Amino acid sequence: MATIHVDVVSAEQEIFSGDAKFVALPGEAGELGILPGHTPLITRIKPGAVRIETEAGEEFVFVAGGILEVQPKHVTVLADTAIRGHDLDEAKANEAKRAAEEALQNQSSDLDLARAQGELAVATAQLAAIARLRRKR
């Protein structure tokens, strides 16, 4: 079966590098599915789970936003923050969500509001990714 090379990197480290049969991730306009030979594309990524189907099975990576570049034989995910699926911490995500909701209640400027909304979106997406991983196991 045809494959496409996938690199998922954050500012801190390379999270995944290898060949895949299929990649699914949350694009700015909705869920994207990438197969080998896909038309070139550059778009922003929303917080959520990147699902990478390899010959050996599925890999999950949580991204907190970033940029996606697709070429016919190569996919690059430049993530603001990326965490391997098995490294996600539900307690930390719940605490981050609670803190963001509290910040929304106590915001004093438009900047505080925007920051709190962004943090809430990331925490909520992280919890959804954790729930999705649990269903797969």
UniProtKB/Swiss-Prot annotation:
<dbReference type="InterPro" id="IPR036794">
    <property type="entry name" value="ATP_F1_dsu/esu_C_sf"/>
</dbReference>
<dbReference type="InterPro" id="IPR020547">
    <property type="entry name" value="ATP_synth_F1_esu_C"/>
</dbReference>
<comment type="function">
    <text>Produces ATP from ADP in the presence of a proton gradient across the membrane.</text>
</comment>
<comment type="similarity">
    <text>Belongs to the ATPase epsilon chain family.</text>
</comment>
<dbReference type="GO" id="GO:0005524">
    <property type="term" value="F:ATP binding"/>
</dbReference>
<dbReference type="Pfam" id="PF00401">
    <property type="entry name" value="ATP-synt_DE"/>
</dbReference>
<keyword id="KW-1003">Cell membrane</keyword>
<dbReference type="GO" id="GO:0005886">
    <property type="term" value="C:plasma membrane"/>
</dbReference>
<dbReference type="InterPro" id="IPR020546">
    <property type="entry name" value="ATP_synth_F1_dsu/esu_N"/>
</dbReference>
<keyword id="KW-0066">ATP synthesis</keyword>
<protein>
    <recommendedName>
        <fullName>ATP synthase epsilon chain 1</fullName>
    </recommendedName>
</protein>
<comment type="subunit">
    <text>F-type ATPases have 2 components, CF(1) - the catalytic core - and CF(0) - the membrane proton channel. CF(1) has five subunits: alpha(3), beta(3), gamma(1), delta(1), epsilon(1). CF(0) has three main subunits: a, b and c.</text>
</comment>
<dbReference type="GO" id="GO:0046933">
    <property type="term" value="F:proton-transporting ATP synthase activity, rotational mechanism"/>
</dbReference>
<dbReference type="InterPro" id="IPR001469">
    <property type="entry name" value="ATP_synth_F1_dsu/esu"/>
</dbReference>
<keyword id="KW-0406">Ion transport</keyword>
<keyword id="KW-0139">CF(1)</keyword>
<dbReference type="GO" id="GO:0045259">
    <property type="term" value="C:proton-transporting ATP synthase complex"/>
</dbReference>
<keyword id="KW-0472">Membrane</keyword>
<keyword id="KW-0375">Hydrogen ion transport</keyword>
<dbReference type="Pfam" id="PF02823">
    <property type="entry name" value="ATP-synt_DE_N"/>
</dbReference>
<keyword id="KW-0813">Transport</keyword>
<keyword id="KW-0997">Cell inner membrane</keyword>
<dbReference type="InterPro" id="IPR036771">
    <property type="entry name" value="ATPsynth_dsu/esu_N"/>
</dbReference>
